[in-house]
Amino acid sequence: MLGVSNIWSNDKGLADFITLSKNPDNVVVLVGMSDAQVKEYSSSTYKDCNLIPIQRTQNQHELSMLYSLADIHVNPTYADMFPTVNLEALACGTHVITYRTGGSPEAIDDKTGVVVEQGNVDALADAVRKMKANPLSSESCRKRAEECFDKGQCFEKYIELYQSLTNQ
């Protein structure tokens, strides 16, 4: 499973990922770790964790490759309004499991991911297990990203809205 953040903290679900990584069936790859975090989470202190800490990628291509290679993108955020990491995962054909936080649930539907209650790590782990056992179609993720979050279509809707407001 993949987690991506610009800055990793418990607000971004870091502690929950540590819990998930203690299950021998899970391998957790976290992208965006600082140098200090890479060193810390690679140390013997975390030897019971299946955790692979990675620094920020060098470009969008590297990041999209990581999303595309992942079975699942997990976003156990506690403090996001509408996280772009969910949209990035969908655009790369990767399913999303996220907490019911801010706009996270709006990015996905029942064909593209699962939403669990914020802070319920057991439900998060169960959703990961179920999705591994019964993967969803990656094409459904790409389709949702293109149909719902294409910037060209979104810009057109904004322009139409602004025009309707100025014509009143």
Predicted regions and their residues:
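A short, well-ordered alpha-helix in the C-terminal region of glycosyltransferases
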Residues: 136-148, 157-160, 164
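Conserved donor-binding/catalytic core segment of Leloir-type glycosyltransferases
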Residues: 1-12, 18-23
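Aromatic "clamp/platform" in nucleotide-sugar-dependent glycosyltransferases that forms part
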Residues: 78
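Short alpha-helical donor nucleotide-sugar binding micro-motif in glycosyltransferases
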Residues: 65-70, 158
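Conserved acidic donor-binding segment of nucleotide-sugar-dependent glycosyltransferases
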Residues: 110, 114-121, 130-135
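A short hydrophobic beta-strand element within the catalytic core of glycosyltransferases
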Residues: 73-74
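Nucleotide-activated donor-binding/catalytic signature segment of Leloir-type glycosyltransferases, i.e.
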Residues: 32, 39-58
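Short hydrophobic beta-strand element within catalytic cores of glycosyltransferases
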Residues: 95-98
